[in-house]
Amino acid sequence: MELQYLHNKLLRIVEKIFSRSDVLTRFYIAVQERTVLEEFSQFDLGTNSRVLIMGCGSIPNTIISLARNKKWKIVGIDRDLAAVENARKIVREYGLKNVDIERADGMEVDLKGYNLIVVALGIEPKNRVLERISKDADSGTYILCRTAGAFSKIFGRENLKIDGLKTIKHYRRKDGTGSIIFVKK
């Protein structure tokens, strides 16, 4: 799991650097957009659905892709102030009115009222955040938890079997990472 920690740290640094360049930011988002939209096509959520994305990062590519293509109300959180400031700037540049970016920790943020909660790949410790979701989110809430997927052979496999969450599906993204879809019992 130490390699996963180093990977996450490196990705945060790269995103902060890329976020300083409009060209690199737009490239980063464009490269991921189709993958994100395919991943989220599994959810049949109404137009007024509320989505919480934990760990939005300096370049909130998942948020941008979803907000441009869905009518969901999206809240992105990150505990890193610099990442929050960068993400807010990018959301403003895209002119997205259905997005709020807040500085918050997944272990403390209010989880009520969301139809879908996304746990980003870089969230640590993922199992503790999922345990909290299993206790505090509304029943019927979907959870999409990003995982190392094919890279688990390198980073190690995470134990993400959590009481109170029913596993719906394991999904393999085109970039080699994966996601596990849960529903809160």
Each language-model region and where it sits:
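Conserved SAM-binding loop of SAM-dependent methyltransferases across substrates and taxa
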Residues: 58-70
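Conserved beta-strand signature within the Rossmann-like core of class I S-adenosyl-L-methionine
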Residues: 140-152
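Conserved class I S-adenosyl-L-methionine
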Residues: 48-58
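Active-site capping/gating segments
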Residues: 151-185
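S-adenosyl-L-methionine
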Residues: 1-46
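Conserved SAM-binding loop
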Residues: 87-88
